[in-house]
Amino acid sequence: MAYKETLKTERLILRPFTIEDFDAAHSWGGNPQNVRYMAWGPNTQEQTREFLTDMVKPGKDFAVVLKATGRVIGSCGIYPDSENDTGNVGWILHMDHWKRGYGTELAGELIRYGFEDLGLRRITSYCAAANYGSYRVMERNGMRREGLRIKAFWARVDKEWVDAAVYAILAEEYNAK
């Protein structure tokens, strides 16, 4: 698979992380309200540094940058399984940027990248069952709900096992829209 380092949408640039992104990454990764629906966090400063060190895989993990300001507002990624021609997409945005369509925009670009550039046949995503914002992002991008994984992961903020809603889209479904 030939990975791209940078992807662009109308309002966003998805680019590799740098260590200079520390403050932005820690602003969402270290905020309990922001990571409530995640299986990780809230991060300590050391955990955020480790995250940034791990995020230098071209074409898989991206910093989400507003074109208008150059500000890093989140992270996203696509994680291919080349053996099965499938991939999983995920994202997190700083809560100050929720409900502005950025999630839908970046997820749409990750899905496009997966099908058109990486040649995947199926893309999945999942979210905490109570994370209605992520449901909407997936559904707006043509993904359909496939099921519910009961007590799928430990939510560190709420300190409880959380169900996960599983979504997917096939290449033929993507191409038909």
Q: What do these predicted regions represent?
A:
Residues 1-35, 61, 65-177:
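Acyl-donor (CoA/ACP) binding surface of acyl/acetyltransferases
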Residues 33-54:
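Conserved GNAT-fold acetyl-CoA-binding loop/helix
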Residues 54-57, 116:
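Secondary-structure boundary motif
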